[in-house]
Amino acid sequence: MKVALLANPARGEINVLLATAYELIRLGHDVTFLTGSSFANAIAEFRSEQNDPILAARIHFSDLGNARAVEDFTRGMQSHLKGLRKPPGDYSSMEICQIVALVTEQEFRDAATMVRDRLLEIEPDMIAVDALSPNLVTGCRMTGLPWMFTVPCSPSLTATRKSLFDPHPMGRRRQRTLMSALENLKLTFIETYRNATKKDLYARRALLKNEFGLNSMGFNGDSAIVPPLWKDRNCVGGIHFNTPGLTDSIRQPHQIHFVGAGVTSDPENHDTPVFEAASFLKQLSPSSSTTFKPLFPPLSKTGRDLDVEWMDEAYAAGQLVVYLNMGSMFLWTDAEVRSCLRAFERLYEQSGGKIKLLFKLNKPKRTPNNTGASTPTAPISSPDFEEKQRTVMGSARPVGASNLVSEKLADAIKNVTPRRKTDADKGYSQFTLSEFEGLEYVRFTRWVHDQRSIYKHPALRVVIHHGGGNSFNEAVHYALPQMILSQWFDTHEYAILAERFGIGLRSKHAPKIDENDLVNTMTRLLQGPEAEKIRRNAKVWSIRSRNAGGAPAAARLIEAQAMLFNQQKQLELAASEVRAAVDTLSGKSSVADLESETAFTPNMLSGAASTVGSD
């Protein structure tokens, strides 16, 4: 059967569909991705990773071009980053996400009709579209074909709010108290007012109703970042890549299936966590040994992975690693990088050299206020930069080095001068990785080649991230305690959920990155009774996430809907043949009865799939 997958090519949206496609092609189905041109290379890489020509031949790419309505919105988000980063409860963060996704009336019309025409040409047995890609969603609705949607964001965005006590997606108070009800009322009023005053939203609502002939989902629903898509007459269900039960938004539509993290069926994703086996073996190792040599291959490698090798060395030295990754959209400022370094230098010293940091540092490829081409390199020269760099480069030391060297490292962190491209980049870190080679307690990386190897490494103890849906749910899947430095929109909800369900801690200063907050929170996560309780809770929720099925469950749900739609087409074809025969032999007297017996609706598909999913 043929399945069409649609999403904006931003990694947060497309990654779960890649995992789902991995499963669908192994079930024998053909998968066609419909997205922007920038995803072409990723599709080619995805094909080559299959190492099987039969599987690779089942992967297809339908290029939707490079128009703003179908291309990666990551750069657009980064251009609004300073306004986007707001504390919990601030509606403007959600509004900026909405504004970045908005396009003009003509751009919206062109994108939706192109998607409709392309899908009708492909004739898929089932369509699955990312709920955060409104232009693509509209094209799917216009086909009249059965379709599904995928949700890679927080649970409250799909929840039905029937009373003021049901938390608003941007709500800071989520305990169903009088104060939370007042906050929800305020946020709902702001949302309604802002939706009514945006001309592009008004034009989009008019297009949906008057030109496209699509049914309304309500005033705020038609304008929402995640509309109530299950209300569309051809929608047969949704797939939520979140763990069942790990939510405070309890009124979820029955058409939506929670499948946990978007993790594939690869056995490497589901075996015993390496750190548990390693801890058990370490207890059995001779007490006289100063280093522990694993009795099993630490990690399978297809090539050198310098990040993993660095973690191997830390583990052999009895050190613990914290992994810091703020996602592909986040850009660090120089002050924030320094705050992190000072915090982890303190942790390193307080632990006697036992705590180290793996730091994924994004580098701005374009100027923050411009989505055009990259700016030419124009580093600023500093008279004492070379001397400061020599201080950093020459400061590597073994565990237990003198306090004098430690003080020099601290001075190097405070004084290091960043290399910048242009003044337009002011405020965003342009550090070169070589500047940190002397800091023994931290390793910087621009790109993680195999994040699974990081998550499963026996040295890893805590993950720090921004609260993105994929980051949060992958940490849950791998039973990793997490610290969430939430930054915008629904990341605050994930931070609140982590703390409420006892699987992590959140920053009390979000979205600011504070040195003392990092030190205090990491100390709580790495040692003591609270840390042990969080580790136990993380293991329990890991089981619940794995039981939900992940990408294999998503693929089976799509397959079930495709099979039902295929049966519908066969029934309709058989009915038309019978109708033609009846017309020839005895007129049309019994055709109406025949049509009523063979009629099939998307609602029946949705109900049937719910039965399949619950078996």
Swiss-Prot record:
Induction: Expression is induced under conditions of nitrogen starvation.
GO cellular component: a single term: vacuolar membrane
Annotated keywords: Glycosyltransferase, Membrane, Transferase, Vacuole
SUPFAM superfamilies per record: UDP-Glycosyltransferase/glycogen phosphorylase (SSF53756)
Single GO MF descriptor: UDP-glycosyltransferase activity
Pathway the protein takes part in: Secondary metabolite biosynthesis
Stretch list, region Disordered: 366-387
Residue spans of biased composition, Polar residues class: 367-380
Main location: membrane
Keyword check for Zinc-finger: no
Domain of life: Eukaryota
Enzyme class: transferase
EC code: 2.4.1.-
Biotechnological and industrial applications of this entry: MELs not only have high potential as eco-friendly biosurfactants due to their excellent surface activity, but also have attracted considerable recent interest because of thei runique properties, including self-assembly, anti-tumor and cell differentiation induction activities, and moisturizing and hair-repairing properties.
Cellular localization per UniProt: Vacuole membrane
Lipid bilayer topology: Peripheral membrane protein
Disrupted gene: phenotype observed: Impairs the production of mannosylerythritol lipids (MELs) and leads the sticking of cells to each other in hydrophobic environment. Does not affect the virulence.
Function according to Swiss-Prot or TrEMBL: Erythritol-mannosyl-transferase; part of the gene cluster that mediates the biosynthesis of mannosylerythritol lipids (MELs), surface-active substances that enhance the availability of water-insoluble substrates. Mannosylerythritol lipid production is responsible for hemolytic activity of Ustilago maydis.
Family: Belongs to the UDP-glycosyltransferase family.
The protein's name in its UniProt record: Erythritol-mannosyl-transferase 1
